[in-house]
């Protein structure tokens, strides 16, 4: 009996990080597959599932990935920690990109990379995860496909992270870096002031060193709206123009 071997399609996030081509997506903090379907109709490229601050459990993550894949959206997720068991479960549910928060050192980043990539690039565990856990006739090729098509974003959210940013950026397997501005503002002594000029100065300096190391920051290629911003903007528009309501 012959089987159709599933193949991973290209990861638009990973490609865009390399080419600096602009892509668009939405940040979700709650499980809402119908919302993913609505967003897909707007021509977005990816969905960002917030597994650190959001309400998702692993069943929610899998359902969101199924909805995203159905509409050709790449699902990426911010994980709550960089440990191998956590990262493995996100990847096994169908997430195509991992965003690692609170990375302070090169060793922190290497720990995450080791969990994200299969050998020889890392030591990711292989088991019964989706979406490609059946009918794999060529397992070595499948593992290579996984490595070639998983995106990795590293978040800098501390003073130590700022200092190590360029060294982290130079690591093979890191596609892009981003800044957790609220946590950075606290770490720099300006809680609740992510737009403070000193925060902006330190972020700009680190961003320039990251680019000099050959990697982009998220804002260089990714446009992302948070779902709360989308909902508030839409409701304000409807309240300002009641005739826009369909009934």
Question: Where does each model-flagged region fall?
Answer:
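Short, acidic/polar
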Residues: 28-41, 81-89, 159-171
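Conserved anion-binding
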Residues: 85, 97-172
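Alpha-helix-loop-beta-strand connector modules within alpha/beta enzyme cores
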Residues: 58-92, 116-121, 144-148, 195-218
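Active-site mouth loops of central-metabolism enzymes
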Residues: 17-33, 76-80, 150-163, 224-232
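N-terminal amphipathic alpha-helix/helix-capping segment at the start of soluble metabolic enzymes
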Residues: 1-27, 136-148, 204-212
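Glycine-rich, proline-tolerant flexible connector loops at the mouths of alpha/beta enzymes
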Residues: 35-62, 181-197
């Amino acid at each position: 009996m012959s089987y159709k071997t599933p193949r991973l399609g290209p990861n638009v996030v990973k490609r865009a990080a390399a080419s600096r081509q602009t892509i668009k997506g939405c940040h979700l903090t709650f499980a809402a597959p119908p919302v993913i379907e609505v967003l897909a109709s707007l021509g977005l490229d990816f969905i960002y599932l917030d597994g650190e601050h959001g309400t998702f459990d692993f069943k929610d993550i899998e359902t969101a990935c199924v909805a995203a894949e159905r509409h050709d959206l790449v699902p990426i997720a911010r994980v709550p920690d960089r440990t191998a068991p956590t990262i493995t479960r996100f990847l096994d549910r169908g997430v195509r990109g991992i965003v690692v928060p609170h990375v302070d050192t090169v060793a922190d980043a290497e720990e995450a990379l080791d969990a994200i990539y299969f050998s020889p690039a890392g030591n990711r565990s292989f088991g019964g995860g989706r979406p490609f856990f059946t009918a794999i006739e060529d397992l070595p090729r499948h593992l290579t496909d996984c490595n070639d098509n998983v995106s990795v974003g590293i978040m800098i959210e501390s003073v130590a992270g700022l200092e190590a940013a360029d060294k982290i950026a130079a690591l093979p397997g890191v596609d892009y870096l981003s800044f957790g501005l609220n946590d950075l503002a606290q770490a720099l002594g300006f809680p609740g002031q992510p737009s403070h000029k000193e925060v902006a100065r330190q972020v700009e300096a680190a961003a320039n060193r990251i680019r000099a190391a050959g990697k982009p920051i998220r804002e260089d290629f990714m446009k992302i709206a948070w779902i709360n911003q989308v909902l508030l903007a839409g409701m304000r528009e409807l309240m300002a123009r009641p005739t826009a309501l369909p009934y």
